[in-house]
């Protein structure tokens, strides 16, 4: 669901795709460094998350440690999830997505880059999803603006 501008009392038209194909953006952002790490994958499961954690681990500065905020999705809490040594997972309480800074990123991407779009095929879904993430990741000010939370800042 998205929002669009329309005259009061009118019913705006928007393209709609009723197929059931999708991909998943596994994304993370560091507001202080204004850096991001992401993978676009065909499934959301513990194997895909392990790939994402490995990608984040590679992007963490040497000697640094990353704290990732996670919700309670099943694959986020898998017992066999391999978490790299330079990453700590912070699990949110149930039904509290507003505490996850990345939720605003997903809302932004859906509302500004991916909404009201009909995709040609699966490859087009992947291409446009990657383009949406790249648009976000290439703007350090936007990364900081959307993901910064005063309660989540660690001062060294």
Give the location of each predicted region:
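RNase H-like polynucleotidyl transferase catalytic core
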Residues: 6, 10-18, 85-104, 118
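Short, well-ordered secondary-structure micro-motifs
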Residues: 1, 78-81, 102
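RNase H-like DDE/DDD metal-dependent nuclease/strand-transfer catalytic core used by mobile genetic elements
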Residues: 48-92
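Residues that scaffold the ATP/ADP-binding catalytic core of kinase and kinase-like folds
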Residues: 39, 78, 108
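C-terminal anion-handling pockets and recognition modules
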Residues: 102-156
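Extended, low-complexity cationic-aromatic segments
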Residues: 1-54, 148-156
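RNase H-like two-metal-ion nuclease catalytic core shared by retroviral integrases
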Residues: 22, 70-72, 90-114, 125
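Short, solvent-exposed loop/turn segments at secondary-structure junctions
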Residues: 30-33, 73-76, 95-97
């Amino acid at each position: 669901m998205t929002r669009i501008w329309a005259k009061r009392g009118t019913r705006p038209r928007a393209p709609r795709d009723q197929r059931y194909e999708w991909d998943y953006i596994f994304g993370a952002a560091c507001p202080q460094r204004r850096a991001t790490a992401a993978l676009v994958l065909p499934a959301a499961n513990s194997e895909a998350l392990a790939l994402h954690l490995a990608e984040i681990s590679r992007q963490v500065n040497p000697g640094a440690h990353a704290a990732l905020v996670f919700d309670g999705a099943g694959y986020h809490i898998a017992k066999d999830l391999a978490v790299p040594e330079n990453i700590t997972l912070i699990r949110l309480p149930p039904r509290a997505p507003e505490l996850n800074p990345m939720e605003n990123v997903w809302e932004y991407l859906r509302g500004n880059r991916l909404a009201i779009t009909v995709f040609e095929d699966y490859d087009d879904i992947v291409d446009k999803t990657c383009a949406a993430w790249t648009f976000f990741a290439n703007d350090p000010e936007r990364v900081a603006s959307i993901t910064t939370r005063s309660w989540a800042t660690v001062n060294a």
